[in-house]
Amino acid sequence: MDKKEFEKEIKKCFKNVNQKFFDQIETYKLFLQEKNEQFNLTNLSDEKIVYAKYFYESLIPYSEIDFSNCKNVLDIGSGSGIPGILLKLIHPNIKLQIIEATGKKLEFMKQLVQKLGLDGVI
C-alpha cells in the first residue's frame, strides 16, 4: 500500500480526517524511519509496509468506534506510538496516556509528541 492508497482508504473509514492528519502521518513516518536504528523500534524495510502494516492495519480496528464521547485513551506498551499516537492524530480532542517500560522507546515517544506538536499526551 503506497501513500496515495493509504490516504484513499483512510478517508473511506474515517470521515473526520483532513490534510493536517496526512501531513502529520508523513512527519511521523519520516521521524520513525530516521530514529528506528537508534531506538530499535520496528522493522521499516519498505515504505509500503509502513503504510499498510503499521499505519493502516493499526487504525482500521478503530474505524467503527465512536470516539465523540471518549475523553481518555490509554496505550499500554506503546513502543513506537502505535496505535495511540495514530488515534490522537485522528481524534485530536482525546487525552492520550502512554505507558512504555522501555526507556529508549519512551524517549522516542517524547521526541515524537514534540515533533508532531501534540497536546494532551502524558
Language-model features: locations:
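Class I SAM-dependent transferase core
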Residues: 5-70, 74, 111-121
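Conserved SAM-binding motif I beta-strand of class I
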Residues: 95-101
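Short, conserved acidic/polar surface loops in the N-terminal third of protein domains
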Residues: 86, 110-111
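Generic structural signal for residues in well-ordered beta-strands
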Residues: 96, 121-122
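Interfaces and regulatory segments of ATP-dependent nucleotide/adenylate/phosphodiester-chemistry enzymes
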Residues: 2
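Conserved SAM-binding loop of SAM-dependent methyltransferases across substrates and taxa
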Residues: 80-93
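Short alpha-helix immediately C-terminal to the canonical SAM-binding loop
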Residues: 105-107
